[in-house]
Design a protein with these regions (language model features):
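Gly/Ser/Thr-enriched, mixed-charge loops and adjacent short helices
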Residues: 5-14, 123-257, 262-263
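Short Gly/Thr/Asp-enriched flexible loops that form oxyanion-binding sites at enzyme active sites
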Residues: 71-79, 122-129, 279-299, 336
Length: 552
């Protein structure tokens, strides 16, 4: 009878955005429930039929969250009722395997029921297109328009499950796709001999954080020769309540509490955690000098994997492909730029969101120009290989363990290898500050910050001189010293990026999905400790600048 609660649940529709749906599970048009899922699927079906691709099926996966199996079945039966074959996994699977399945089964699209690392009351629905990447223009806008056009739930179709199976419109998938996916991962191993030699001695602690990673991660590690894998027992089994963590996010230190406790008990070399849909990976490794476990940021683990993969590809093949490319998002560490320069590969930048990295792979395939070597973003997601077109923490776990075996052969831990990289390329430290400004007022304030920064380019940021400003909304790049102006060559987006002296930078970006504005930044210091201090001071000064703007 709570009127406020009723209003909250029905005052608007849960918006189907560029990333699909994400919301709190419950009754109401502003919640995640079978009706909202059916409406989204009907919109997708209408788009597929209008594109004339209804003869190709749709792959469907889901994670360990509340209602995930039910929502995925609802989506499958809606597609079946529209005459589109649904290939639904028999049980929970990681996001990257869904991305793989879309292409493996020659589907037109994929649906993944997941809310990644959100709190337990949330669930979500992500759509993939036939290349296996999350939808990008023009498909995202086209599908959104079709979903929006459905104004009555009576216009959505569904079908009896038994009938759908009898008609061959609902097909259950499982071990065949699993085996094919595992086979693709094994092809990406660069140093099986290092695993054979040192993998047995390596002690690895792993937690799937109650999600989808447990079976595939343990399977791949076991099959390639890692015998000492200790799984955190309290977090091993899928559980949509995520009872042992406040927030099942491998970026959060708290998510590692139980894993680090186990690591100390078994004297592990490496501590790994995948998020509930197993597309992002967090990592700790032992510092051989002090014996303590050190945390890797997403930028650090991504850079380490990038260096390992590219250096070993070169060693194995004698050289790298002439058109070899490393892909990163614009807010990812500049250490990658230094790696690309050192190995003479192309460096391609794109906007945040892994679908944009997936889009670059598609461009390489369509044009025949560009060989994908490695891609990653700062938010703990990377992709080795092109079997999937989304972040893949299963392959990243495999590769990090392989790298740990390789460096062990040189008497080093992964942390030691990271320190060597800093010596080689410079002490790059990157971080992010987020300011939350809720409601209509908050939205105005975020707009105000962007307008002020856009109209008055700061001569310096945190004491670093501004060299180049990139305005992705006004679509220009301006060199402050020479006055030269050129186009960004990027799609339009409300993002500002300042290239500063000494390889420092700042990027400002309002979140597309939350009432937040994000400030990503990076500096390059002369030692590890000094760079950490410098980065902290830089972040404080950026916040001072922003609060000054808000007070005006």
């Amino acid at each position: 009878d709570d009127e406020k609660e009723i209003e909250e649940r029905f005052y608007c529709d849960l918006v189907f955005g560029t990333a699909g749906l994400r919301g709190i599970i419950g009754a109401g048009t502003n919640r995640m429930n079978i009706y909202v899922v059916r409406k989204a699927t009907q919109g997708l079906a209408n788009y597929i039929i209008k594109a004339g691709k209804q003869d190709k099926g749709v792959a469907i996966a889901y994670d360990s969250r509340r209602m995930s199996p039910e929502f995925s079945m609802e989506a499958a039966l809606c597609l079946a009722a529209n005459g589109i074959k649904a290939y639904r996994f028999e049980s929970l699977r990681p996001t990257p395997e869904l991305s793989f399945a879309v292409r493996y089964l020659d589907c037109v699209a994929g649906i993944n029921v997941t809310a990644s690392h959100n709190p337990p009351e949330y669930n979500g629905y992500k759509v993939y297109w036939e290349d296996g990447a999350q939808i990008t223009p023009p498909h995202d806008q086209g599908i959104m328009a079709e979903v929006k056009a459905i104004t009555d739930f009576a216009d959505t179709k569904t079908m009896d499950m038994v009938e759908a199976k009898k008609k061959g419109l609902l097909v259950t998938i499982g071990s065949e796709v699993d085996d094919a996916y595992m086979g693709e991962l094994k092809k990406l191993i660069l140093n099986q001999d290092a695993i054979d030699k040192y993998g047995k001695d390596l002690k690895i602690v792993y937690t799937p954080l109650h999600g989808t990673g447990n079976i595939p991660v343990r399977r791949i590690l076991k099959e390639i020769g890692f015998e000492n894998v200790y799984v955190v027992p309290e977090q091993e089994l899928p559980d949509g309540e995520f009872p042992t963590v406040e927030y099942p996010n491998p970026e959060a230190k708290e998510a590692f509490t139980l894993a680090l406790k186990l690591a100390k008990e078994v004297d592990a070399d490496l501590v790994l955690a995948t998020d509930p849909d197993a597309d992002r990976l967090g990592c700790y490794a032992k510092d051989s000098k002090t014996g303590e476990y050190k945390v890797f940021t997403g930028n650090m683990s991504g850079s380490l994997l990038c260096e390992y993969e590219v250096s070993q590809m070169k060693e194995k093949n004698g050289s790298l492909p002439a058109d070899g490319a490393i892909v990163k998002t614009i807010v990812t560490t500049n250490m990658v730029d230094a790696i690309a320069k050192y190995y003479g590969t192309d460096l391609i930048e794109c906007f945040t969101g892994f679908k944009n990295i997936g889009r670059e792979i598609l461009r390489f395939e369509q044009t025949g120009k560009g060989t994908y070597l490695f891609g990653f973003e700062e938010s703990y997601g990377c992709l080795i290989g092109t079997h999937a077109r989304d972040k893949d923490a299963v392959v990243a776990t495999m590769a990090l363990c392989e790298a740990a075996a390789y460096y062990r052969g040189q008497g080093k831990t992964l942390w030691d290898a990271m320190m060597d990289m800093y010596e080689k390329y410079g002490y790059y430290v990157d971080d992010i500050k987020t300011v939350t400004l809720k409601g209509v007022e908050g939205s105005k304030k975020i707009g105000h910050i962007m307008n002020i920064l856009r109209a008055n380019v700061p001569e310096q940021v945190a004491g670093y001189k501004t060299k180049v400003v990139r305005d992705y909304r006004l679509e220009y790049i301006r060199n402050i010293e020479t006055g030269e102006v050129k186009p960004t060559g990027f799609p339009n987006a409300n993002v500002l990026y300042y290239e500063l002296e000494n390889d420092a930078w700042l990027a400002v970006r309002p979140s597309g999905t939350e009432p937040k504005i994000k400030f990503y930044y990076g500096i390059k210091g002369s030692s590890y400790d000094e760079a950490q201090k410098e980065s902290a001071a830089f972040g404080d000064k950026v916040m001072d600048l922003i609060y000054d703007i808000l007070e005006k």
